[in-house]
């Protein structure tokens, strides 16, 4: 659930610009670098901007769409980003029709991001979210075929369904060494997608000589669109075991050099797997989540988390903003859907099971723990607890504000995060 946090008005008057060209006939830029007063909206904007590092967005497109969004309104966010995605997709298809493969690829990659960004706040998690999520995947699949080498679509059999994903391989890997390449499995969080993980892990890993598998697991939108009953589960070592089984049988994968990298909620999933499965030879936790219940209480606030009144998704339909903020209405629907529970209280009880507890000392492979210094007191506390309790060698990195990488999952500096992550992985398994 997303809390509504606004920045207080400044007491001091706003300083005037030292130089203004408003009355000039030459204007260098009419674009203003402006975000939102709502902190979560700002983070989601940074999240969309961040993937520009690997071709997933452009600064101009993201800043232009801000003007179409009402601060704090999930509905206007979803509509504005969907319109942007449609415009960019149309350009990409025009380039494809004209035989301009590189231009088509670039546009379709960005359209995929903008559809995913719209999906995050789509008003209905079973309707609008489904539509934009499918279009995000469709654009990425077409772009993936235009990459060099093409990204491979994978379907991992699991419990009567399948987990969709992508295997991203380095250039020239078709003639790779006997025994295969080191391989990283990227594990996303509550609202991530395999397509987004391509920009965070797939592209930076492939250019460093790694295979990278990114996938959508139980509870994540890309999985639930095709497997509606595959909701989140605390024993994520089970689906991750199926992913490792799939990779271990491939000749282009070195099964003795398998690593996991979990982002956000995904770090809990990855840590569970590393504790249970000795085939995992290295683990990256970004940031470590050892207790999801504590984490969520700190995020939404104690009063909201412990409220005595239970709320079901159907209870909030049409409720005015002044009675229940739109973001909270959206959040209740999203958490109930993804966890497969009927109400807020049922969700609060369910996430009690998402704790590492005594499992952390069982993680004996090398571990890299990452966190941004401005993620907040609770993530930093869980980071320190995890580092202290891990049973194997651990390297810890706190990203600083001055490095431009202090946000959640270093969404503001993916290239720096990738450098730290893959340099460490090369030292362990390269």
Language-model features: where?
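N-terminal cap/lid segment of alpha/beta-hydrolase-fold proteins
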Residues: 81, 131-176
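Primarily recognizes the serine-hydrolase "nucleophile elbow" in alpha/beta-hydrolase
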Residues: 116, 248-303
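Short beta-strand element of the alpha/beta-hydrolase
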Residues: 178-189
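Alpha/beta-hydrolase active-site loop
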Residues: 230-252
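Short beta-strand/loop motif that positions the catalytic acidic residue
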Residues: 363, 369-371
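Short alpha-helix in the alpha/beta-hydrolase fold that links the catalytic acid
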Residues: 365, 378-388
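Catalytic histidine neighborhood in serine/cysteine hydrolases
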Residues: 387-406
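Catalytic active-site module of serine/aspartate enzymes centered on a nucleophile-bearing elbow/loop
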Residues: 410-430
């Amino acid at each position: 659930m997303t809390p509504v946090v606004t920045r207080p008005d400044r007491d001091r008057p706003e300083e005037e610009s030292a130089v203004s060209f408003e009355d000039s006939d030459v204007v260098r830029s009419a674009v203003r670098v402006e975000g939102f007063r709502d902190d979560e909206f700002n983070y989601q904007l940074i999240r969309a901007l961040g993937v520009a590092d690997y071709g997933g967005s452009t600064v101009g497109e993201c800043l232009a769409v801000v003007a179409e969004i009402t601060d704090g309104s999930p509905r206007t966010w979803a509509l504005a980003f969907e319109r942007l995605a449609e415009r960019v997709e149309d350009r990409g298809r025009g380039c494809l029709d004209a035989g301009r493969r590189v231009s088509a690829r670039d546009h379709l990659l960005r359209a995929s991001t903008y559809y995913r960004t719209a999906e995050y706040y789509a008003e209905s998690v079973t309707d609008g979210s489904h539509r934009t999520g499918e279009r995000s995947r469709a654009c990425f699949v077409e772009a993936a075929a235009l990459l060099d080498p093409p990204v491979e679509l994978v379907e991992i059999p699991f419990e009567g369904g399948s987990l969709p994903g992508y295997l991203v391989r380095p250039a020239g890997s078709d003639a790779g060494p006997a025994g295969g390449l080191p391989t990283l499995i990227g594990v996303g969080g509550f609202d991530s997608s395999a397509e987004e993980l391509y920009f965070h892990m797939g592209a930076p890993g492939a250019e460093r000589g790694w295979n990278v598998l990114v996938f959508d697991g139980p509870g994540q939108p890309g999985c639930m669109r095709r497997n509606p009953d595959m909701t989140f589960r605390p024993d994520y070592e089970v689906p991750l075991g199926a992913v490792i089984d799939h990779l271990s049988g491939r000749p282009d994968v070195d099964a003795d050099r398998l690593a996991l990298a979990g982002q956000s909620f995904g770090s809990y999933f990855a840590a569970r797997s590393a504790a249970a499965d000795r085939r995992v030879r290295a683990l990256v936790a970004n940031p470590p989540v050892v207790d999801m219940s504590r984490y969520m209480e700190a995020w939404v606030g104690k009063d909201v988390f412990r409220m005595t009144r239970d709320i079901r998704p159907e209870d909030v339909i049409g409720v005015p903003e002044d009675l229940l903020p739109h973001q909270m209405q959206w959040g209740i629907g999203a958490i109930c859907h993804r966890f497969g529970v009927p109400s807020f209280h049922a969700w609060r009880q369910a996430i009690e099971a998402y704790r590492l507890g005594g499992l952390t000392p069982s993680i004996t492979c090398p571990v890299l723990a990452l966190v941004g210094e401005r993620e907040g007191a609770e993530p930093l506390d869980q980071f320190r607890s995890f580092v202290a309790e891990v049973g194997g060698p651990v390297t810890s990195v706190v990203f600083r504000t001055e490095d431009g990488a202090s946000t959640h999952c270093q969404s503001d500096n993916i290239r720096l995060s990738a450098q730290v992550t893959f340099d460490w992985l090369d030292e362990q398994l390269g």
